[in-house]
Amino acid sequence: MLKASLLSFVAFTAQVAHAAFGITTSSSAYVIDTNAPNQLKFTVSRSSCDITSIIHYGTELQYSSQGSHIGSGLGSATVTATQSGDYIKVTCVTDTLTQYMVVHNGDPIIHMATYITAEPSIGELRFIARLNSDLLPNEEPFGDVSTTADGTAIEGSDVFLVGSETRSKFYSSERFIDDQRHCIAGDAHRVCMILNQYESSSGGPFHRDINSNNGGSYNALYWYMNSGHVQTESYRMGLHGPYSMYFSRSGTPSTSIDTSFFADLDIKGYVAASGRGKVAGTASGADSSMDWVVHWYNDAAQYWTYTSSSGSFTSPAMKPGTYTMVYYQGEYAVATSSVTVSAGSTTTKNISGSVKTGTTIFKIGEWDGQPTGFRNAANQLRMHPSDSRMSSWGPLTYTVGSSALTDFPMAVFKSVNNPVTIKFTATSAQTGAATLRIGTTLSFAGGRPQATINSYTGSAPAAPTNLDSRGVTRGAYRGLGEVYDVSIPSGTIVAGTNTITINVISGSSGDTYLSPNFIFDCVELFQ
């Protein structure tokens, strides 16, 4: 018994024994030992830059059949590894991309950054860690909504039916402003992607993209720096990151990771704190029941912050330049301005704005840039519209004054629930000229609203900008946020009962939930 215990102790000690911090070089690979207490050691191919092995606490976590890498792999690259004091830097260079992997002595973290001068040929910029799904089966924080193992594809190659539930890797998404950390985990290991810098990504604070996907063969942990997934702006070049892959035994790591040491490591495109400035001020005027966000952007960078409850704000440290500055209530823009940022200083800039309509006859929803409260909005981020857990899409009739907000659909699909009907009662004082304002958040296949008020049909609006991306079926609701005004002639509205129908129109067609559609933000009738 004593002998068996001694052997077990020796085996355990050997498993967790610390090796020296450093690089072991072979003809084909660099092996990087972080000297972390929980033993993190990984191998990088010298020909492709793929991570081909990740050993954490004595256990191989890397998927054996395919590496972890940028995009779908660089194919070939010039790969070097250097050590300087307590830091090791792996550099992978192609004609248009440089990938950095950095470790600090004693830390169980692979810090990364990606510098580009052109968009990758696959049309998106992402890092994907392909890890052992037996050891790391779970996805955090949203659970199995993106676990597609053993599923049957029901839309394209990325939406699946697993048992009675629809699932997709897209259902793992979180708004950039709220996504500082996402993880995959098992009983003995947790791997988290820590994201403290989105400045070179695209889409703004409310954009969202794939975070994880357990497809069975491996569990994928992503950071999408940009993609064509409901993308609303051009891609940015330059340095993306730093972003950090953190390995732990248990517990969720802090998102407060200091990567200022990048300034001393000759990282192309890295701008240290001393070369940055800030914007501080007060936002005012918007609906105080909602979160307020201030957003800055130009062709080179983007930043954002929530304001305090009083409206005060200070931006993150920003690259110098002139920025468009936007103030949101929820996700609805209420003011736009411009500000110039200089290195080493803080610029004071206040901003004010509110939603302006008129004398409201009725309002369905709120001007928050989201389909908040509408039917199926609470589920749409995490399941397909066809899911049995969804409520009936209709067609629905909403009666002002008596219907619940959930009696109004978050989206109208040309082949599913078209049209939406609104019934309301007007007084004689409300029969004059009026405006029906229809706020939308996202359009698919040219879908846009055309309204009929009693016997009067408003003109057909022009087609919105085509983002060329599935949206509502893949858990997205935010696009360009088109708002449509219907001018209603005096006498169209009558004293008593009135009926409005809102049809989705488009020159395109499609089946069920891939038919032309749009998502509602708010509908307001005012004079």
Curated annotation (Swiss-Prot):
Effect of H229A: Impairs enzyme activity
Catalytic activity, EC: 4.2.2.23
Leader sequence segment: 1-19
GO MF annotation terms: carbohydrate binding; rhamnogalacturonan endolyase activity
GO biological process annotation, one example: pectin catabolic process
Mitochondrion recorded as keyword: no
Reactions catalysed: Endotype eliminative cleavage of L-alpha-rhamnopyranosyl-(1->4)-alpha-D-galactopyranosyluronic acid bonds of rhamnogalacturonan I domains in ramified hairy regions of pectin leaving L-rhamnopyranose at the reducing end and 4-deoxy-4,5-unsaturated D-galactopyranosyluronic acid at the non-reducing end
UniProt key word Secreted: yes
InterPro entries: Carb-bd-like_fold (IPR013784), Gal_mutarotase_sf_dom (IPR011013), Galactose-bd-like_sf (IPR008979), GH-type_carb-bd (IPR014718), RG-lyase_II (IPR029413), RG-lyase_III (IPR029411), Rhamnogalacturonase_B (IPR016590), RhgB_N (IPR015364)
Thermal dependence of function as given in the entry: Optimum temperature is 50 degrees Celsius.
Compartments where located: Secreted
Disulfide bonds: C49-C92, C183-C192
Glycosylation sites: N350
Family annotation (Gene3D superfamilies): 2.70.98.10, Carboxypeptidase-like, regulatory domain, Galactose-binding domain-like
Keywords tagged on the record: Carbohydrate metabolism, Cell wall biogenesis/degradation, Disulfide bond, Glycoprotein, Lyase, Polysaccharide degradation, Secreted, Signal
pH-activity relationship: Optimum pH is 6.0, enzymatic activity becomes unstable below this value.
Gene Ontology CC terms: extracellular region
Protein's job: Pectinolytic enzyme that has a positive effect in the apple hot-mash liquefaction process. This endolyase hydrolyzes the alpha-L-rhamnopyranosyl-(1,4)-alpha-D-galacturonopyranosyl glycosidic linkage by beta-elimination, thereby generating oligosaccharides terminating at the non-reducing end with a hex-4-enopyranosyluronic acid residue.
Record-stated family: Belongs to the polysaccharide lyase 4 family.
Name of the protein in question: Rhamnogalacturonate lyase A
Organism of derivation: Aspergillus aculeatus
